[in-house]
Amino acid sequence: MSSPSPVTDGLNVYVMTGTGILKGFDFAGKELWVRDIQQDYGKFGLNWGYASSPLLYSDSLYVQVLHGMKTDAPSYLLRIHKKTGRPLWKVERPTPAITESPDSYTTPTLVRHSAEVEIVVTGGDCMTGHDPETGKELWRANGFNPDNDPFHRIIASPVVADEIIYAPTKVRPLMAFRSGGRGDISQSHLLWSFQNGPDVPSPVSDGKYFFSVNDKGIAWCLDAKTGKEIWGPQRLTPAIYSASPVLANGKLYVINEEGLTTVLKAGPTFE
């Protein structure tokens, strides 16, 4: 099982499998080290298997295990030294989520605010920010499951642009928060919310425009700062859309499960 994507620092490559095997390789394919996360910390308990990719920052890999559907074990965040595979810390991430809602298939991301860097994690009906040096939780945003749906797992990952954190959930709500908060930022740092977000594909933003494509190929463009709808809903070729859109050179590349790529202009008009 290889749902997670590999990451590289340009010198080595790091791979996490769906069965919890985390390895480092050089570019010649030589294995540098290996860790078995399930052996070290217990079996994963996600309903659909493990799928979060590791986050690479500075000298470390950050690995989230957010689960609950098939386990009573706590969710946690790990920091692993990229050169040796040695664990540097493990912190638990408690939430009140129940049944399948603790499960998260997202990948953590970074947010930079002024001179500070934080690890952003979504899942378990909330979003948290962590100190990359210690793992300490710095802030938390709640309200990700307003209907208390016991099956409100999250698949689409958070994204960051211009110090704004965009956090999708299971379609709704998709919320945008300004960075720099401490403690409970659920209301104090909330910028806007959107009720037509994706389930599986992660959104993308260039800081000016925010683009979202849902599982049915319905595309939207919002003002990244205010959440105002610029265009959408616009239907792409009917199919299932699971891959996240890619933004490059002023264009938005969207691939569906039939292998068709749609290229859109990444701007205020749908074309």
Kindly give the residue locations of the regions a language model identified.
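Noncatalytic, solvent-exposed loop/strand surfaces
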Residues: 1-271
